[in-house]
Amino acid sequence: MGVAVTVMCNDGTTANGYALKATNPSNKFLFVFHEWWGLNDYIKQTSEQLFKDLNSEVNIIAIDLYDGKVAAVRDSAKAYMSALSPERANVIIDGFLTHVGDSAQIATIGWCMGGGYSMQASLQLQQQALGCVMYYGMPESNTERLKTLQADVLMIWPNQDKWINKEVVDTFKANMVSLDKKLFVEEYNADHAFANPSNPKFDNEAATNANNKALIFLKSKFGIN
């Protein structure tokens, strides 16, 4: 359904992604950010489902932050995530921003590691950012950087998450309020990565509800019925 894409980055390197093109020409884009596993078949299938759920009206690009590497086991995933520098991620995101052009209106979504990069991308997109969905991802804690955010944020938070814990979320809420930024937090009685069917702690009911909330949020930002 989608196609592999390669774009040039401003440092002379290339970046990879998986793209689905809107049925009719559109400047609306959704940047999708993978979990620590990499841009695997699950993320591609999720991107395809998002494309359908957004009525094929939005261009979808699942961005590969690992430059082609995909992990099959946790040790590899941990190593790949640790090896990813914020600088390289910024270069990759900027490459795709240049690729879609100055007129593009872009929302972001991601899970786990990708949830954090969903927020970082929205910060990087500045006035082109439409909205940010972050599933159990680490929010930006630097208020000087956070004040530049121009997108509303939907945070999907499982309250059993030991990494993105209550302290992290409460601090993020307080920072967003102090900066007069819009944050919507959907809390679930679930654990980290509850939305991924391959996770032993997958919660189908919570995942379905969270997906519906994410779609309502994204459709409102894209102006889709």
Predicted segments, located by residue:
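Serine-hydrolase catalytic machinery in alpha/beta-hydrolase-like enzymes
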Residues: 3-101, 198
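Acidic catalytic loop of the alpha/beta-hydrolase fold
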Residues: 160-164
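Alpha/beta-hydrolase fold nucleophile elbow
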Residues: 101-111
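Gly/Ala-rich beta-loop-alpha elbow adjacent to hydrolase catalytic centers
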Residues: 110-114, 118
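Short alpha-helix in the alpha/beta-hydrolase fold that links the catalytic acid
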Residues: 45-46, 165-175
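Short beta-strand/loop motif that positions the catalytic acidic residue
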Residues: 149, 155-157
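C-terminal catalytic histidine-bearing segment of alpha/beta-hydrolase fold enzymes
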Residues: 179-225
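A conserved short beta-strand
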Residues: 128-138
